[in-house]
């Protein structure tokens, strides 16, 4: 698929429907959206006092429906029984905004960490059942996360995830800032997802401001997104190799990741692509010599990655450790709202790139679902390997001509709320911007990691405790994305 074909099939702007719902009709409205084939992709609170609002987002193709209801001092009814994917959204709103959801009580703390430990632990009792607590301080140089395993022998009954230890309040900090300045909060939420978060924020703001991204701007942003996907997928394959003790594969893909990040720095001036994206503009400016040099480096990188992948693919001992471990079946993946490579490895053809207005992708973009989408570690690894090939092809196409910084054109219709959905390396990132003139009234950033952490807990149950590090690495989720 050529870039021109992508541009013809991709709408230039996000399509958003804002629908006000009476409080008494809230559950019925959400049920109708789900029954109509729409997919829950986030919820958030806004407003204050008697004008407090609860909003739920549902997606279908390039269109996003925002259902909103005013509930005042009374809490809205829960929809977790309709879509379990909403559980974290409701628990977070309870902790940060004091919302009480009728039908979802008692609500275990998610963001808050009260000293009253029984208030947030899951009681599991039975003969031979005991707990293994891991974290939040770990032996490795990683961020803070607490995993409480309930096991019989070495078999995991369930794992309770406790994150948000270093929550920074970025969404609240962004309130009152200029729309153009608010991008810094989204960009710095997570280094590994900086480009995806920045593009999502920029597209949401441009929808509010009536700006339409130009051809060059769409191409530059897609280039940055694919560069980010490249080094993340290389890193994730290296991590799985480390999880099974395959040092040769770990070292090979870690070296490939380093080369990809050095390429980022040479093209964008930053290894994590910070500072390349603006609201209504792009700072990326690559003349012919730069793109030619980058294409050559990417060609070599692709050949070396294919060679390293063959070493993994034909290693019987590695494959034996991956098959059948950490299975996430399709029904659970859909029910829990899994996105990205995790969802595709479970057989769900879900890829936001096929429905990303304002970018280079189009409706002809096909999700990479492996032939044997068993939902296990092997399938999640294979999805990333397949997507590496797609990303290399996309990058070669995007760099076929010089890339110039360009701006979005004004004069388009403005929206009362800006919503953007962008496919990050880990899956769909959803950004909502509610404006107050040219300032941020409310920012909501729901990343793929936020969506996938509950799916990780589900995939872990029934496995052996020593296999958890491997399962965890096959998801490779961000802590910072939930600590935003």
Language-model features and meaning:
Residues 1-159, 314-321, 325, 343, ...:
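Terminal low-complexity/charged segments
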């Amino acid at each position: 698929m050529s870039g021109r074909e992508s541009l013809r099939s991709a709408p230039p702007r996000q399509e958003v429907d804002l629908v006000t719902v009476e409080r008494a009709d809230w559950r019925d409205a959400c049920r109708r959206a789900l029954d109509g084939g729409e997919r829950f992709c986030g919820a958030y609170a806004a407003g204050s006092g008697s004008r407090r609002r609860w909003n739920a987002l549902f997606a279908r193709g390039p269109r996003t429906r925002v259902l909103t209801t005013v509930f005042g001092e009374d809490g809205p009814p829960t929809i977790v029984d309709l879509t379990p994917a909403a559980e974290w959204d409701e628990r977070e709103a309870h902790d940060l905004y004091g919302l009480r959801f009728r039908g979802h009580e008692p609500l275990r703390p998610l963001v808050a960490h009260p000293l009253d430990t029984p208030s947030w632990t899951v009681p599991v009792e039975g003969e031979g059942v005991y707990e293994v607590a891991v974290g939040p301080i770990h032996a490795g140089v990683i961020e803070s996360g607490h995993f409480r395993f309930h096991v019989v022998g070495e078999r995991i009954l369930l794992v309770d995830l406790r994150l948000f230890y270093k929550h920074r309040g970025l969404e609240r900090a962004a309130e009152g800032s200029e729309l153009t300045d608010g991008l810094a909060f989204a960009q710095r939420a997570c280094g590994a997802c900086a480009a995806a978060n920045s593009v999502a924020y920029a597209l949401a703001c441009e929808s509010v401001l009536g700006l339409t991204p130009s051809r060059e701007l769409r191409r530059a942003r897609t280039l940055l997104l694919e560069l980010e996907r490249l080094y993340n997928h290389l890193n994730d394959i290296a991590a799985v190799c480390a999880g099974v003790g395959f040092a040769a594969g770990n070292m090979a893909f870690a070296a490939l990741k380093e080369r990809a990040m050095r390429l980022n720095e040479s093209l964008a001036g930053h290894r994590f692509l910070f500072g390349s994206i603006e609201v209504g503009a792009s700072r990326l400016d690559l003349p012919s010599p730069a793109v030619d040099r980058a294409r050559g480096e990417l060609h070599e990188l692709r050949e070396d990655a294919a060679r390293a992948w063959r070493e993994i693919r034909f290693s019987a001992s590695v494959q034996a450790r991956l098959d059948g471990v950490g299975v996430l079946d399709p029904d659970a993946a859909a029910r829990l709202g899994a996105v990205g490579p995790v969802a595709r490895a479970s057989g769900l053809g879900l890829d936001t790139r096929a429905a990303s207005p304002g970018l280079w992708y189009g409706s002809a973009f096909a999700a990479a679902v492996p032939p044997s989408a068993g939902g296990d570690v092997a399938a999640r690894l294979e999805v990333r390997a397949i997507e590496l090939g797609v990303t290399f092809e996309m990058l070669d196409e995007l760099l076929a001509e010089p890339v110039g910084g360009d701006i979005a054109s004004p004069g388009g219709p403005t929206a009362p709320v800006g919503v953007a959905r962008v496919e990050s390396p880990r899956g769909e990132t959803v950004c909502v911007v509610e404006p107050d003139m040219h300032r941020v009234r409310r920012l909501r950033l729901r990343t793929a990691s936020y969506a996938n952490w509950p799916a990780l807990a589900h995939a872990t149950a029934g496995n052996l405790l020593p296999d958890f590090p491997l399962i965890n690495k096959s998801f490779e989720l961000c802590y910072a994305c939930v600590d935003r």
